[in-house]
């Protein structure tokens, strides 16, 4: 994976959040090779900088425009945030027929990545955004443990990539539709 600028550089535990933020804003992709938990902290630190930047930008434009304009600007800011954070990537590799994340203190990703991506081919590797990997790991926990849906009175076990009913008002709304006679 390369960024729009075509550059990918290695980042590790010595990479500061300010340095990472500057590189990411220039379009560079950062291949994380440090400690797993430090990588998560780096993502949060870069996200805080993006939030501050959006707040400063938003304050200038806050009064200008309609509610629709504000909504569109918020969507643009979120898309930009996702695009920038998505350029912090990690390499997954196949080992013994399972996915492996070879970072210090990394969780076992074999089950989660196998569930989301399928079993790897021999020698296969995959470069994925760190944030996407976090989503895969979280979704796998939802799949294993289930998500309580009060409107149903039971748990559902969503797969990765499937809408998870974590916002009960959506399920309640669908449940209320059964009361309407069309």
Task: Describe the function of each predicted region.
Residues 1-20, 24, 29:
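Non-catalytic protein-protein interaction scaffold segments in large eukaryotic complex-forming proteins
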Residues 2-4, 16-19, 59-63, 148-153:
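Short amphipathic alpha-helical segments, especially helix-boundary/capping motifs
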Residues 9, 28-147:
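N-terminal auxiliary segments of SAM/dcSAM-dependent transferases
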Residues 131-178:
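Class I SAM-dependent transferase core
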Residues 180-182:
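Conserved small/polar residues in nucleotide/adenosyl-binding loops
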């Amino acid at each position: 994976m390369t960024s729009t600028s075509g550059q990918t550089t290695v980042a590790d535990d010595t990479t500061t959040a300010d340095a990472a933020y500057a590189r990411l804003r220039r379009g560079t992709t950062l291949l994380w090779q440090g400690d797993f938990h430090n990588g998560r902290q780096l993502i949060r630190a870069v996200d805080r900088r993006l939030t501050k930047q959006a707040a400063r930008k938003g304050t200038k434009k806050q009064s200008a425009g309609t509610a629709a304009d504000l909504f569109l600007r918020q969507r643009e800011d979120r898309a930009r945030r996702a695009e920038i954070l998505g350029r912090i990537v990690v390499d997954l590799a196949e080992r013994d027929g399972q996915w492996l994340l070879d970072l210090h203190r990394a969780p076992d990703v074999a089950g989660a990545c196998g569930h989301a991506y399928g079993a790897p081919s021999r020698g296969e590797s995959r470069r994925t955004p760190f944030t996407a990997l976090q989503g895969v790991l979280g979704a796998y926990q939802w799949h294993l443990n289930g998500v309580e849906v009060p409107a149903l009175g039971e748990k559902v076990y969503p797969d990765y990539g499937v809408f998870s009913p974590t916002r009960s008002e959506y399920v309640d709304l669908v449940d209320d539709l059964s009361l309407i006679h069309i």
